[in-house]
């Protein structure tokens, strides 16, 4: 019987001035081994830390680890609210976007980089170098993963953007996150990639052929930029829409990327 487990970690964030939580998957054999690589996996716009079980990430990981198809690893799914994972406001608060939807603004990049990662490294038996630290995410979480990895290339060695919300321009519905065009460009994965000097990591991009956001276009452009820089990047267009079913149908492929 597999003895993996999921733990809930709650911290009082100084960056956001509120309590934040995350779920942490510990693989079978965690207590016996010395250290493990760590995958940070980011949820989408309407998700939270429960995304890890919502997409069966723990179940698929159990199966692949048991079959020796991937290396055992720690998986962390932090709650990032509906924030895009950026530093958008010194004051953490909820605001309405142009479509009257609630979004969260605050120092979310600082929260993840300066609080979540150090807390996980302190609590768990992680490999505390970039070679043993990976980041990925789906939809808005894919956007979070890409910009955090590109802006902090010294921290991560594998990066995954799965149906990532990579836009070709600042859309009206996203203007509540960004004060002006310059703020958008600061976090736009395509813009960052053009200026990036670090090339020592592996990147996995994918989107559905019927993705309602057309994010396969951004993935193609980003992949071409990365490959021109000599970065080991792969881009896939699989069958499907922009939904949870697409993620669940491809999660095994993602884990084979992170785990090998």
Feature locations, PLM:
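Non-catalytic cap/lid and distal C-terminal segments of serine-dependent acyl enzymes
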Residues: 1-260
